[in-house]
Amino acid sequence: MPYIKTINSLEVLDSRGNPTVEVEVITLSGAKGKTLVPSGASTGEHEAVELRDSDSKRYLGKGVLKAVENVATVIEPRLQNLSVLDQALIDQTLIQLDGTPNKSKLGANAILGVSLACARAAADYLGLELYEYIAGIAPKQMPVPMMNVINGGAHASNSVDFQEFMILPTGAPSFKEALRYGAEVFHHLGKILKQKGLPTTVGDEGGYAPDLNSNKEALQIILEAIQNAGYVPGKDIFLGMDVAASEFYDRETKKYLLASENNKTFSSEELVSYYEQLINKYPILSIEDGLDQNDWDGWKLLTQKLGQKVQLVGDDLFVTNTQKIQEGIDKQIANSVLIKLNQIGTLTETLEAIEMAKKASYTVVISHRSGETEDTTIADLAVAMNTGQIKTGSCSRTDRIAKYNQLLRIEKNMSNPSYLGLKVFYNLKK
């Protein structure tokens, strides 16, 4: 029987040593599903709320015992005897139990853990892989990995303003080969940094975090690594950036401060021009969060200027929220949506956000968080929903590699996997 018997929850640690929630759902038939919930460092102000204990005597106030208790005392009694095959009902029940617009009562970390664990239990009950269960009969394609090879901003302790510098191996014939391209570039990048006397320590997402002088220097070094690995920039491999502009935006002056540009301040218009210069000089295919999450006028200008040349991804801008995404679609803001499960808090709402973006011809990127675990749900989700792109870090740290290895297994198991490469960016004039 696919009905929920028990829901177990546990306070465990994420990749940054901070507490997070693990949830296991067990059905009357014995089918099981277990999920660990990720956590972000730079978060959008409209995200669903992680419930933390704020007890300074435990984990510097970051404990999640309240969320764990909510699973046991509030959620489990209400979900017992519901079918794990009815994901929509489960998620609707979770949302109603919480009763707040941002899931702050029970905690998005508790709610998401239960939602995803139920989906895994359903897949186990049916004898399916998670991606097969979510996808149904939909065609399945492997995603282009957006590999974060240099970390800056809130993800590293260096002087680089932008949070992530990524490589996109669009010229590879398969995901397996794309991963190889990326790994080889990553290792060549490490060699270059050593030759320059720079440290090869890594940031939260596994990319190197060298103390470079500017954002342009980061792009230049990555280009050198691509070439040293034997690949052609702008053909085999493109570049991407997660600017995370909200992190260096001053809301009082409405200016952007770039420390690596001699502490120069930029207006929205000037920052858009700065990006335009970068994409004219470097083979940049994607820019994420290029402006502050509340700078909608700036986003409008950015989209008008660069929206047909480069993928403009909204993360903090949209926070996987259908209301925010619809507002962006109506105002013709950005052309791509980043999807983070814990920004919204249930699988059903996540799938609705993906479908909304696709119907508006926005591209979709499935993403990890900077605080990750060994959980591989996002790998299955990227394939199941044919998003075509995934952000899950660099080629180091097991919490990142776990997702890549899961994608390799999925590709091997699929009868006729497709890897579209550059065709994924269907809304650009490339």
Curated annotation (Swiss-Prot):
<keyword id="KW-0324">Glycolysis</keyword>
<dbReference type="GO" id="GO:0009986">
    <property type="term" value="C:cell surface"/>
</dbReference>
<dbReference type="Pfam" id="PF03952">
    <property type="entry name" value="Enolase_N"/>
</dbReference>
<dbReference type="InterPro" id="IPR020809">
    <property type="entry name" value="Enolase_CS"/>
</dbReference>
<keyword id="KW-0479">Metal-binding</keyword>
<dbReference type="GO" id="GO:0000015">
    <property type="term" value="C:phosphopyruvate hydratase complex"/>
</dbReference>
<feature type="binding site">
    <location>
        <position position="163"/>
    </location>
    <ligand>
        <name>(2R)-2-phosphoglycerate</name>
    </ligand>
</feature>
<dbReference type="InterPro" id="IPR020810">
    <property type="entry name" value="Enolase_C"/>
</dbReference>
<keyword id="KW-0456">Lyase</keyword>
<feature type="binding site">
    <location>
        <position position="242"/>
    </location>
    <ligand>
        <name>Mg(2+)</name>
    </ligand>
</feature>
<feature type="binding site">
    <location>
        <position position="315"/>
    </location>
    <ligand>
        <name>Mg(2+)</name>
    </ligand>
</feature>
<comment type="pathway">
    <text>Carbohydrate degradation; glycolysis; pyruvate from D-glyceraldehyde 3-phosphate: step 4/5.</text>
</comment>
<dbReference type="InterPro" id="IPR029017">
    <property type="entry name" value="Enolase-like_N"/>
</dbReference>
<keyword id="KW-0963">Cytoplasm</keyword>
<dbReference type="GO" id="GO:0006096">
    <property type="term" value="P:glycolytic process"/>
</dbReference>
<dbReference type="GO" id="GO:0000287">
    <property type="term" value="F:magnesium ion binding"/>
</dbReference>
<feature type="binding site">
    <location>
        <position position="288"/>
    </location>
    <ligand>
        <name>Mg(2+)</name>
    </ligand>
</feature>
<comment type="similarity">
    <text>Belongs to the enolase family.</text>
</comment>
<protein>
    <recommendedName>
        <fullName>Enolase</fullName>
        <ecNumber>4.2.1.11</ecNumber>
    </recommendedName>
</protein>
<dbReference type="GO" id="GO:0005576">
    <property type="term" value="C:extracellular region"/>
</dbReference>
<feature type="active site" description="Proton acceptor">
    <location>
        <position position="340"/>
    </location>
</feature>
<keyword id="KW-0460">Magnesium</keyword>
<dbReference type="Pfam" id="PF00113">
    <property type="entry name" value="Enolase_C"/>
</dbReference>
<dbReference type="InterPro" id="IPR000941">
    <property type="entry name" value="Enolase"/>
</dbReference>
<dbReference type="GO" id="GO:0004634">
    <property type="term" value="F:phosphopyruvate hydratase activity"/>
</dbReference>
<feature type="binding site">
    <location>
        <position position="391"/>
    </location>
    <ligand>
        <name>(2R)-2-phosphoglycerate</name>
    </ligand>
</feature>
<feature type="active site" description="Proton donor">
    <location>
        <position position="205"/>
    </location>
</feature>
<comment type="function">
    <text>Catalyzes the reversible conversion of 2-phosphoglycerate (2-PG) into phosphoenolpyruvate (PEP). It is essential for the degradation of carbohydrates via glycolysis.</text>
</comment>
<feature type="binding site">
    <location>
        <position position="370"/>
    </location>
    <ligand>
        <name>(2R)-2-phosphoglycerate</name>
    </ligand>
</feature>
<dbReference type="InterPro" id="IPR020811">
    <property type="entry name" value="Enolase_N"/>
</dbReference>
<dbReference type="InterPro" id="IPR036849">
    <property type="entry name" value="Enolase-like_C_sf"/>
</dbReference>
<feature type="binding site">
    <location>
        <position position="369"/>
    </location>
    <ligand>
        <name>(2R)-2-phosphoglycerate</name>
    </ligand>
</feature>
<feature type="binding site">
    <location>
        <position position="340"/>
    </location>
    <ligand>
        <name>(2R)-2-phosphoglycerate</name>
    </ligand>
</feature>
<keyword id="KW-0964">Secreted</keyword>
